[in-house]
Amino acid sequence: RESKFLKGLRCTDKDTMEVVIQVLCGSVNKGLTAEIESLGSRAIGLSGADGGMIKAVRYSDDKELGFAGKVSSIQSDVIELALNNGYIPVISSVGYDIHGQAYNINADMVAGHIGAAVNSERVIFMTDVDGVFLDKDLPESLISELSVKKAEEMIDSGVIAGGMIPKVKSCMEALELGIKSAVIINGKKPEQLMAAALGEYAGTRFFEE
């Protein structure tokens, strides 16, 4: 069945939610964990249910979105325990409300909240393009630095659209949560990830005026 998106968010009915849990918390999570281990690092696969890590609520009253959710809080104990023992936590973006109902949450939104919960200085969002463009068909129109105010204007005007909206909003939210640096880079280019991790210029960096 073809996925339906609304404002960049996946519409998630009951049946789709079951598939999301099986795939994100199962095959994808364990596949990434195994791949990291194969490269010589220690990793542990986790989901929002573990230790009550990701508390969620319904994203909106829009019935089309169904079980699409948003983060209400992060319990970081399990994450910090993993990090303090030398493990890279691989976390699926499924959260649960106080009644145990699962919600499909945009992974970028979860990443920003987790970054803030563990006091990260920098959060890096990866996609399949080099960052935010004034014109997606013109590579030279890449915006290297973007203020929160300007980003909001670009969303309102439709320059930033589709799946880029939640990524940009996640960057904005990360800054609001106290993270010093939020960047969108091309995850297919290792050199961009290395540069962003070192605090060098890559992709689109967001800042508050």
PLM segments and residue spans:
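Nucleotide/pyrophosphate-binding catalytic subdomain
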Residues: 1-192, 208-209
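Active-site loop ensemble at the mouth of alpha/beta enzyme cores that anchors a bound cofactor
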Residues: 198-209
